[in-house]
């Protein structure tokens, strides 16, 4: 089965006389015959949000709180630029924007002791400049931080940033994944490749007990699932931004 066929038809098999399109069910809860069956619906790799902007915010804020610093490409979507330069600045998060085509030495100079992550877009919106993911990943890892890549414009059909070294990938499903016509949403995908415990002092939210969640230390309890589990159990719980039924079909 080809990607195009899966993207259009996979996951819904209507019976005789049933609608070709999956119906929207206005319900917040669903019945399952066993906890095992329900557990098979979930994976540690990703989560959905109410918008692409929510996905980018959660992806960054999950590991970069007040007092933290982000190194970001200046060649990014205006909304993401303002999220970092204005909104998150009000929350105590600092950002240094760099020319993504600058030399490794110039980009290295942007890092600080409190840098928590790097951020860029596979294809910049709207200038369509291509990010050198391997270069960014190498630089980020040399400084002990993960690389977060917004893959909205490229979509997984054209590029899989994790294959090139990205640790966390975000999408605005509103755009190319959906067609920018029938729904609004976002997604965060974690590769599970970044070793949070090896850089424990940089990421206390993952490597020390969370008083809001029974004292759990996410990195120790959940291993590769630590990042997404924290984003779901903590940020989604406290800040919302869940997909609505009308955008979940």
Describe the predicted segments one by one.
Residues 7-9, 13, 47-249:
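Conserved PLP-enzyme active-site core in the AAT-like
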């Amino acid at each position: 089965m080809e990607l195009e066929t899966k993207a259009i038809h996979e996951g819904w098999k209507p019976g005789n006389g049933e609608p070709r399109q999956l119906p929207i069910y206005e319900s917040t809860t669903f019945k399952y015959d066993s906890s095992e069956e329900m557990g098979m619906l979930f994976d540690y790799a990703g989560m959905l949000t109410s918008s692409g902007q929510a996905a980018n915010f959660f992806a960054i804020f999950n590991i970069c709180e007040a007092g933290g610093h982000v190194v970001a490409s200046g060649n990014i979507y205006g909304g993401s630029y303002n999220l970092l330069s204005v909104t998150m600045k009000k929350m105590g998060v600092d950002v240094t924007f760099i020319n993504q085509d600058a030399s490794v030495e110039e980009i290295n100079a942007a890092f600080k002791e409190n840098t928590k992550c790097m951020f860029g877009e596979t294809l910049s919106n709207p200038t369509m400049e291509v990010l050198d993911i391997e270069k960014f990943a190498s630089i980020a890892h040399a400084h002990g931080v993960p690389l977060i890549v917004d893959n909205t414009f490229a979509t997984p059909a054209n590029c899989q940033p994790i294959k090139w070294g990205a640790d966390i990938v975000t999408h605005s499903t509103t755009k190319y994944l959906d067609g920018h016509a029938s729904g609004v949403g976002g997604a965060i995908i974690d590769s599970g490749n970044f070793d949070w415990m090896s850089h424990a002092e940089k990421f206390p939210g993952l490597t020390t007990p969370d008083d809001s969640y029974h004292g759990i230390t996410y990195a120790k309890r959940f291993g590769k699932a630590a990042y997404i589990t924290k984003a779901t159990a903590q940020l989604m719980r406290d800040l919302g931004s869940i997909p609505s039924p009308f955008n979940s079909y």
